[in-house]
A protein has these predicted regions:
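Generic transmembrane alpha-helix signature in multi-pass membrane proteins
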Residues: 29, 58-65, 163-165, 175-180, ...
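Juxtamembrane transmembrane-helix termini in multi-pass membrane transport proteins
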Residues: 20-73
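Juxtamembrane transmembrane-helix boundary motif
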Residues: 1-13, 34, 61-160, 211-272
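Transmembrane alpha-helical segments that form core, pore/gating elements
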Residues: 146-183, 187
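Interfacial segments of multi-pass membrane proteins
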Residues: 28-42, 174-189, 208
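Membrane-embedded alpha-helical segments of transport systems
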Residues: 49-57, 78-90, 197-204
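Transmembrane alpha-helix interface/packing and boundary motifs in multi-pass membrane proteins
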Residues: 11-21, 158-167
Length: 272
């Protein structure tokens, strides 16, 4: 029965991506774990495929409008792609299933992934809730002339690649400010470039799983993706009538509640 809710949630993920242009994919791992019964570590691999594929759709629209900075994307992706591939190919398989035990509590690899993901959800939610104020601050920064900040872009690229590889999320809330502050990109150009970065990061990370021999249930994964893509098509149409920017704070509060719930559930009620 929960599987039906899971496929409905996949449509909702796509719908939110279509309307808001990003953010919805942060729900992919929780949906796969709690509604579809996929293990947390495998869910991060599946999430990379779903996030990567949906971001390709989003980025292609921006690319056609000339809203992707290829130079910035290349600089950002140099450390990012290496990091995400190394994490999926080498680090994730090397982490032991049981990290440590404390009384009845068994801290496992799955628990580590879920806790890290929940913390990321809370951070991303805070960014969405404050999106309007943050955009105004970033737009103000563009009035001050600065050179292209290679160290900042390369450093954030490395951080995002590692983060994406570990939890299977895109990290757009980190990428966009870095592109505005470090590459001096206007907001629309930063959003389009961010989607291109997320698409490549996620799909290269997923290829790391494939090369590591991670078993993939392709029929299930492609079916889940199909529902998400259907949601994107519907969301893109509805975006003509619904202001996505106004929905983002509400979606942020929902994501904050979900992240807090996962933290409470896994840390307070988890016993291995």
């Amino acid at each position: 029965m929960l599987h039906y809710f899971g496929y409905f949630a996949a449509i909702f993920i796509g719908l939110s991506l279509g309307i808001m242009g990003g953010g919805g994919s942060i729900l992919t791992v929780p949906v796969l774990v709690y509604l579809m019964g996929v293990s947390p570590v495998l869910s991060t691999a599946y999430s990379l495929f779903v996030v990567g594929s949906t971001s390709v759709v989003g980025a292609s629209g921006y690319f056609r409008k000339g809203l992707v900075s290829l130079r910035t994307a290349v600089v950002f992706l140099m450390p990012s792609l290496l990091a995400v591939f190394a994490v999926r190919k080498v680090l994730m398989p090397a982490i032991p299933h049981v990290l440590f035990t404390a009384g009845r509590i068994v801290f496992t690899k799955d628990l580590l992934v879920l806790v890290a993901f929940a913390v990321l959800m809370v951070a991303a939610a805070t960014s969405m809730i404050r999106s309007k104020q943050a955009e105004e601050v970033l737009d103000e920064e563009l009035h001050f002339p600065h050179a292209f900040n290679y160290p900042l872009i390369l450093t954030i690229g490395l951080v995002v690649g590692t983060l994406t590889g570990f939890v299977g999320a895109g990290g757009g809330f980190l990428i966009i400010p870095a592109l505005v502050l470090g590459a001096r990109l206007p907001m629309k150009l930063a959003v389009g470039t961010s989607l291109a970065i997320i698409a490549l990061n996620s799909l290269i990370g997923f290829s790391g799983d494939l090369s590591a021999g991670t078993p993939i249930a392709w029929t299930f994964l492609l079916g889940f993706l199909a529902f998400a893509l259907g949601g994107i098509v519907l969301g893109t149409y509805l975006a003509r009538f619904i202001p996505g920017a106004k929905l983002k704070p509400a979606f942020g509060w929902f994501t904050l509640a979900m992240g807090s719930f996962i933290l409470a559930k896994e840390l307070l009620f988890h016993h291995g």
